[in-house]
Amino acid sequence: MSLAGLHRPGGVHCGAVPALALKIVPETDLLLVISHRLHLHEFLPAHGGQFGPDAGLLPGDAGSGQSVGGGFVGVAQLHLIMGAQISQGALALPVGILDPVDGVGIIDQSIDGEVTGETPQHGQIIGSVIHDEGLIISPALLDSPDGLSQHLLMGLAMLPGVFRGDAMHRGGTLGDLHPGVGEQFEWGGSGIGDSHHRGGDDAGFKGVGGGGFQVEGEHVCGVEVGGEFHRGIHGFNPNQRPGHRVPPPDAIRDHLESGTVTDDNAQLRRTWNELAEKVRYHRDLYYNQQPEIPDADFDALFRQLQDLEEQHPELAVPDSPTKEVGAPVTEQSSFDNVEHLERMLSLDNVFDEEELRDWLARTPAKRYLTELKIDGLSIDLVYRNGMLERAATRGDGRVGEDITANARVIGDIPHELTATEEYPIPAVLEVRGEVFIPIEDFADVNAQRIEDGGKPFANPRNAAAGSLRQKNPEDVKKRRLRMITHGIGYSEGFQPASQHDAYLALAAWGLPTSSYTEAVETADAVVDKVLYWADHRHDALHEMDGLVIKVDDIASQRALGSTSRAPRWAIAYKYPPEEVTTKLIDIKVSVGRTGRVTPFAMMEPVFVAGSTVSMATLHNQSEVKRKGVLIGDTVVVRKAGEVIPEVLGPVVELRDGTEREFVFPEHCPECGSTLAPTRAEDADWRCPNTRSCPGQLSQRLTYIAGRGAFDIEALGEKGAQDLIRNGILVDEAGLFDLTEEDLLESDVYTTKAGAVNASGRKLLANLEQRKNTDLWRVLVALSIRHVGPTAARALAGRYRSMQKLVDAPVDELAETDGVGMIIAQSFKDWFEVDWHRAIVDTWAAAGVTMEDAETEQLEQTLEGLTIVVTGGLEGFTRDSVKEAIISRGGKASGSVSKKTDYVVVGENAGSKATKAEELGLTILDEEAFVRLLDTGAV
């Protein structure tokens, strides 16, 4: 057996759930404080009056409300303020604050209706509050039955389920609402019980007098009142976002085609945004809360983001999650912060034999240790004079949560170390380990959890992470947690010569070490261990998601050092994803921006590689035939840590004769036009109704609004569909001519009363602001085939004017560096179409800038040079380093070849650095790169 089958996961992530801290909507009474784990701390009803803990809140006063029910503690706040001003710190907020339980997940579920993802109707949240890239762009005005959005119903509208015109909340009627100065408001009625709100005992909320808040009843949605409101309150799964019922399959494929310069390259920015948001979201959950995906899934997403940034340096931003360790402890944490004595780093990953051997070649050692990578939760223990002083989570690597009380009830963690003659107890010892639930105990833990009225954990890793953060140590004790040590941080009085010696000492002191750790001396032996555990990964006591390889000699470890996030002397080999089977219920098609009609599989939900999936792209009808899948088949599904699952093929032996063949539609499902391939040899069938097909137009509008083009926050997929459905836009030409009067015909951008809402006002403001933008962004927004950001920058940089571009001969355009004849001809062909030219003319008439201002040209120190940048640079972002090269006449390339003149290597440099060494290319550090920029020489 070889490692050929143990390949690196790839793909893209769509539908990321954001992690924003604060969003203010100008000129409305609504402000969202978004977080991932919140406590209901305070509730302050006010209606243009004076309300506070003592009924004395005036505009500008510091309002803190009153603690709720005795058990609600924490820093997150739930305010609903109508027309009053609250001072929160130094910020006076003359707006309403709504802090929804568990943040955006609830917003997501509320806006999109039930899990089936139906279109929002009156009585639900009105407005496109979720951007197609997964970002909150504005809280919408909350429209609800009988105009109650003008009162306190907006607070309730963020709870699970949807409000409808009949005032039903998932089958349960709402109680009476009586907002007003000094009056009570109640949330009761039929209550929120099993039949009304998916579980839990009835709960009634009352606002009393001048702002007090009382909680009656025991549970809301099965979550104890007075405790922590978390994901269990609504069962939202970000991997099944109703808001993104299925990523447009042609967009999925567009993302995967990022290696060539096509019109689809602008999708890369969206792909990066989605991946980054997903990483940030799950990183926070992973380190600070209840994880929703396993370690393997998180690491695969992280690697995708790293690879994408390496391949396309222009995508990254300064605060990219690829430069950080863990996640900061949130203000909403129930635990105190504690600093690690020595920084707690992460691990870099490899996914195939080539990458592993490359690392081994770069990291020669006399002996390596191979250890199973436990799929659990990292823990940091500090012993002082042999006594357990404190335990903490990883946090951001420097500061974690103090979980000492919970650690003391884990049987594997000794309260006092045992000294031996060979290994006396150090004065200070910081131990690193992993907490987990044994596989054989997981089913029993889940069974007990269900019996207690809770929801089952998705996997042992999530169970361990959630258990370790319980507030009551007695609850932790019931979870059968185990711990295995895997290293030492800071120590006084103990300096081992090797990692192996450290493990011998830990075991002697009474700390558990792994029986699976082995020492090997050659690269081939390391590979053999990887192969062995690939076949025996389910034989271990615990779940494992890889094999960790460490340089054994401590002196060598110190010499190798570490990057900002991981040691250079250790690597984690990640195994390929799980493969599971499920039923293929149906095959449907979707229409993308370019008219490509793409089939996708609808499957019975199945858990694979850390999340539940129910849809997968099938690319085109030829692929459906190649895979041999029939509707009704049991199919094999693989998910390599990315969000996009893959249907590998059918389990033919399980067919019972009821399966049927998929018939590709003859007509576009969006507009009814006859479908056909552009050329006879094309595998993709397209809708020819380019201008008016609602499916294509909505995708183009969303693309125009994306960060790679005009970056119009308030225009997302739902908003685009609404503008088309209501006849407000017939093509993209009229986008910048939209007026408030036009938006009155919208469902998304108006209130139930018929006025333009906050999202509508923000859309108009965004459009006005974005009229003054760079020419290259305008070119990208036109969706000209093959003209992505790279070609657009090159053309705009050379001609600086749309008119000059249009007038330029095709041969001259083709001479532009990085363009060529294919792109040049595509550009000229696009302008041959009347309605295409009308888009440019109409935008220009509306005030969209069609030329770049003249700027002083920098000295062309890099003229004729091709430069590749890999890894992070301290003084540059991904975008700025590319701009620095291009503006000085150089070519910023994304791949290393013999034609590359220089390779600039920063932190966390990837395989490009290795390839540069193999090719004998000149490698520069950041200092040398800066000299090259300034002088043209190194």
Curated annotation (Swiss-Prot):
<feature type="binding site">
    <location>
        <position position="668"/>
    </location>
    <ligand>
        <name>Zn(2+)</name>
    </ligand>
</feature>
<dbReference type="InterPro" id="IPR004150">
    <property type="entry name" value="NAD_DNA_ligase_OB"/>
</dbReference>
<feature type="active site" description="N6-AMP-lysine intermediate">
    <location>
        <position position="373"/>
    </location>
</feature>
<keyword id="KW-0862">Zinc</keyword>
<keyword id="KW-0520">NAD</keyword>
<dbReference type="InterPro" id="IPR018239">
    <property type="entry name" value="DNA_ligase_AS"/>
</dbReference>
<dbReference type="InterPro" id="IPR004149">
    <property type="entry name" value="Znf_DNAligase_C4"/>
</dbReference>
<keyword id="KW-0436">Ligase</keyword>
<feature type="binding site">
    <location>
        <position position="687"/>
    </location>
    <ligand>
        <name>Zn(2+)</name>
    </ligand>
</feature>
<keyword id="KW-0479">Metal-binding</keyword>
<feature type="region of interest" description="DNA ligase">
    <location>
        <begin position="261"/>
        <end position="938"/>
    </location>
</feature>
<feature type="binding site">
    <location>
        <position position="434"/>
    </location>
    <ligand>
        <name>NAD(+)</name>
    </ligand>
</feature>
<feature type="binding site">
    <location>
        <position position="671"/>
    </location>
    <ligand>
        <name>Zn(2+)</name>
    </ligand>
</feature>
<dbReference type="InterPro" id="IPR001357">
    <property type="entry name" value="BRCT_dom"/>
</dbReference>
<keyword id="KW-0235">DNA replication</keyword>
<feature type="binding site">
    <location>
        <position position="371"/>
    </location>
    <ligand>
        <name>NAD(+)</name>
    </ligand>
</feature>
<keyword id="KW-0464">Manganese</keyword>
<dbReference type="GO" id="GO:0006281">
    <property type="term" value="P:DNA repair"/>
</dbReference>
<dbReference type="InterPro" id="IPR010994">
    <property type="entry name" value="RuvA_2-like"/>
</dbReference>
<dbReference type="GO" id="GO:0003911">
    <property type="term" value="F:DNA ligase (NAD+) activity"/>
</dbReference>
<keyword id="KW-0227">DNA damage</keyword>
<comment type="function">
    <text>DNA ligase that catalyzes the formation of phosphodiester linkages between 5'-phosphoryl and 3'-hydroxyl groups in double-stranded DNA using NAD as a coenzyme and as the energy source for the reaction. It is essential for DNA replication and repair of damaged DNA.</text>
</comment>
<dbReference type="Pfam" id="PF12826">
    <property type="entry name" value="HHH_2"/>
</dbReference>
<feature type="binding site">
    <location>
        <position position="693"/>
    </location>
    <ligand>
        <name>Zn(2+)</name>
    </ligand>
</feature>
<comment type="similarity">
    <text>Belongs to the NAD-dependent DNA ligase family. LigA subfamily.</text>
</comment>
<feature type="binding site">
    <location>
        <begin position="295"/>
        <end position="299"/>
    </location>
    <ligand>
        <name>NAD(+)</name>
    </ligand>
</feature>
<dbReference type="InterPro" id="IPR001679">
    <property type="entry name" value="DNA_ligase"/>
</dbReference>
<dbReference type="InterPro" id="IPR041663">
    <property type="entry name" value="DisA/LigA_HHH"/>
</dbReference>
<keyword id="KW-0460">Magnesium</keyword>
<dbReference type="Pfam" id="PF00533">
    <property type="entry name" value="BRCT"/>
</dbReference>
<dbReference type="Pfam" id="PF03120">
    <property type="entry name" value="DNA_ligase_OB"/>
</dbReference>
<dbReference type="Pfam" id="PF03119">
    <property type="entry name" value="DNA_ligase_ZBD"/>
</dbReference>
<keyword id="KW-0234">DNA repair</keyword>
<feature type="binding site">
    <location>
        <position position="574"/>
    </location>
    <ligand>
        <name>NAD(+)</name>
    </ligand>
</feature>
<feature type="binding site">
    <location>
        <position position="394"/>
    </location>
    <ligand>
        <name>NAD(+)</name>
    </ligand>
</feature>
<dbReference type="GO" id="GO:0006260">
    <property type="term" value="P:DNA replication"/>
</dbReference>
<protein>
    <recommendedName>
        <fullName>DNA ligase</fullName>
        <ecNumber>6.5.1.2</ecNumber>
    </recommendedName>
</protein>
<dbReference type="InterPro" id="IPR013840">
    <property type="entry name" value="DNAligase_N"/>
</dbReference>
<dbReference type="InterPro" id="IPR012340">
    <property type="entry name" value="NA-bd_OB-fold"/>
</dbReference>
<dbReference type="GO" id="GO:0005829">
    <property type="term" value="C:cytosol"/>
</dbReference>
<dbReference type="InterPro" id="IPR013839">
    <property type="entry name" value="DNAligase_adenylation"/>
</dbReference>
<feature type="region of interest" description="Unknown">
    <location>
        <begin position="1"/>
        <end position="260"/>
    </location>
</feature>
